[in-house]
Amino acid sequence: MNCKTLYYDTYGRSPDAIAFCPYRISPLGAHIDHQYGKINGFAIDKGIHIAYSAKHNGVVELQSLNFPKRAQFHIHSIPEEKVGDWADHCRGAAKMLAEKYPLRVGLSAVIEGTLPVGGLSSSASVIIAFLSALANVNGIQLGDWETIMMAKAAENKYVGVNCGKLDQSCEVLSKRDQLLYLDCRDDSYELIPRNPAMKPFRIAILFSGLERSLANSKYNLRQDECKAAAYSLMAYAGMDYASSSTPG
């Protein structure tokens, strides 16, 4: 694991722990989650690893194997607005955690993504893995849905991406050889096991050669377009969109 090696090279010792969050694949659900629809997906064995150790002075030190430049902030003075670099996802995660729990301990961390950036929810994976690490050094235990909604809030409120909960839910709730089926209106879900009668199959993940960040893409425009389409369709059907929507 390269993040462990870089951590040792940087700090002269091994990290205290490794946090991991998988990437996800969603056969159905893109732009459905933020419109309170039903989605499905599953996690894969690739994802984000974070090698980390506690820092009792409250400082968070970050470096990444996928991005240049290091980042640093204090858990008691997290910038109110995003800085505009790769570490905003970690700042947002720390800010959401600090709004609910008292934080005393920071950490030193090396972050490693095992696939090219973008396309398989790497931003959500970074946030969830970092939330796990920061919560751990502060003795905080987060439940599954608490993690999902906190990670979603970090993207919505801090990074500025108006995503739904598809990515976070797939990464937190998925189990091996099962498909997650989630209703984004009421958060009810089930894990559907693979039917023994199914023929063997494989799923291929192809890299287009392009890397992207949702924060720098037209994702929010797509979200607005989906909402406008929903308003139009429901108005045509004589349905009240406002009464059919719930916060998510």
What are the roles of these predicted feature ranges?
Residues 1-18, 25-38, 76-77, 82-196:
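Gly/Ser-rich oxyanion-binding loop with an adjacent helix/lid
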Residues 41-43, 51-54, 100-101:
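Short, charge-rich binding segments
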Residues 36-43, 222-223:
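Short Gly/aromatic-enriched secondary-structure transition segments
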Residues 43-46, 175:
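A generic beta-sheet turn/junction motif
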